[in-house]
Amino acid sequence: MSGGLDVLQMKEEDVLKFLAAGTHLGGTNLDFQMEQYIYKRKSDGIYIINLKRTWEKLLLAARAIVAIENPADVSVISSRNTGQRAVLKFAAATGATPIAGRFTPGTFTNQIQAAFREPRLLVVTDPRADHQPLTEASYVNLPTIALCNTDSPLRYVDIAIPCNNKGAHSVGLMWWMLAREVLRMRGTISREHPWEVMPDLYFYRDPEEIEKEEQAAAEKAVTKEEFQGEWTAPAPEFTAAQPEVADWSEGVQVPSVPIQQFPTEDWSAQPATEDWSAAPTAQATEWVGATTEWS
């Protein structure tokens, strides 16, 4: 498919990307029309996809996309969430029309509805999940390109790109590769220099994982600010005037306070106290008389 040109041959770095993303790993089931793209079967039943055939079909799909004069006439679709971000990134890079999420039935056939479109080329992520746009494309003679796994049905698919269309990394990498080849064939970017866009931007990320990472980053930033604040706080300045003393043993004068003298008395020389036993007796008699009078 590359025509024997060295410039179109698959590079070693591309093979490493495919292997890292698991693009060569298919499923345990095999469709009879996908047998031509299979390299081998593992002992655990997983089929290995021939990456050479994947690269050839990728170049063929890129040539078909470049052949469309108006980039907006190319519709790229992904109903599964693993390919929605990749579809939007591909559309932003190449100028295609994305449909991420649920495909409204009748978009290609019902002229009454507001979402009616007449594209010239259709690219889908999964023929099984995106069966509705493929079926409608067959009604309006629309050529189709699809990322196909080992068990994907090839009905209504004109150009099948064999790859792992289940994994988020594999799907993102395939859309990134397709966008890069389209831009290279258009002459937008050079083949001599690597594309500055990273494949990570095409990968699907779980919203819960993104939220957890944001919370962890926020907590780390707050902790860092508190730590820096403790060490960077200015030291308090003491403005109280300190007495200048040359010799500390002689400089400080302690005022002498006279000790107050209290007169001492001889407690044994005091007169004897009265007889305490007589007074209570008299009082008691008076109280008895008073009580007698009451009775």
Swiss-Prot record:
Residues 266-295 are annotated as: Disordered. It comes from the Eukaryota. The record marks A115, F116, P133, L134 as: Cleavage. There is a cross-link at K89 (Glycyl lysine isopeptide (Lys-Gly) (interchain with G-Cter in SUMO2)). The modification Phosphothreonine is found at T97. Its main location: membrane. Expressed in most neurons and in a subset of glial cells. The overall distribution of LR correlates with that reported for laminin-1 but also with brain regions classically associated with prion-related neurodegeneration. Gene3D superfamilies: Glucose-6-phosphate isomerase like protein, domain 1 (3.40.50.10490). The modification N6-acetyllysine is found at K52, K89. [DE]-W-[ST] repeats lie at residues 230-232, 247-249, 266-268, 275-277, 293-295. Acylated. Acylation may be a prerequisite for conversion of the monomeric 37 kDa laminin receptor precursor (37LRP) to the mature dimeric 67 kDa laminin receptor (67LR), and may provide a mechanism for membrane association. Cleaved by stromelysin-3 (ST3) at the cell surface. Cleavage by stromelysin-3 may be a mechanism to alter cell-extracellular matrix interactions. GO terms for biological process: antiviral innate immune response; cell-cell adhesion; cytoplasmic translation; epithelial cell differentiation; ribosomal small subunit assembly. Residues 161-180, 205-229, 242-295 are annotated as: Laminin-binding. GO terms for cellular component: basement membrane; cytoplasm; cytoplasmic side of rough endoplasmic reticulum membrane; cytosolic ribosome; cytosolic small ribosomal subunit; glutamatergic synapse; neuronal cell body; nucleus. Residues 54-113 are annotated as: Interaction with PPP1R16B. It is found in: Cell membrane; Cytoplasm; Nucleus. Keywords: Acetylation, Cell membrane, Cytoplasm, Isopeptide bond, Membrane, Nucleus, Phosphoprotein, Receptor, Repeat, Ribonucleoprotein, Ribosomal protein, Ubl conjugation. Required for the assembly and/or stability of the 40S ribosomal subunit. Required for the processing of the 20S rRNA-precursor to mature 18S rRNA in a late step of the maturation of 40S ribosomal subunits. Also functions as a cell surface receptor for laminin. Plays a role in cell adhesion to the basement membrane and in the consequent activation of signaling transduction pathways. May play a role in cell fate determination and tissue morphogenesis. Also acts as a receptor for several other ligands, including the pathogenic prion protein, viruses, and bacteria. This protein appears to have acquired a second function as a laminin receptor specifically in the vertebrate lineage. It is thought that in vertebrates 37/67 kDa laminin receptor acquired a dual function during evolution. It developed from the ribosomal protein SA, playing an essential role in the protein biosynthesis lacking any laminin binding activity, to a cell surface receptor with laminin binding activity. Monomer (37LRP) and homodimer (67LR). Component of the small ribosomal subunit. Mature ribosomes consist of a small (40S) and a large (60S) subunit. The 40S subunit contains about 33 different proteins and 1 molecule of RNA (18S). The 60S subunit contains about 49 different proteins and 3 molecules of RNA (28S, 5.8S and 5S). Interacts with RPS21. Interacts with several laminins including at least LAMB1. Interacts with MDK. The mature dimeric form interacts with PPP1R16B (via its fourth ankyrin repeat). Interacts with PPP1CA only in the presence of PPP1R16B. Belongs to the universal ribosomal protein uS2 family. This is Small ribosomal subunit protein uS2. It comes from Rattus norvegicus (Rat). The lineage of its organism: Eukaryota, Metazoa, Chordata, Craniata, Vertebrata.
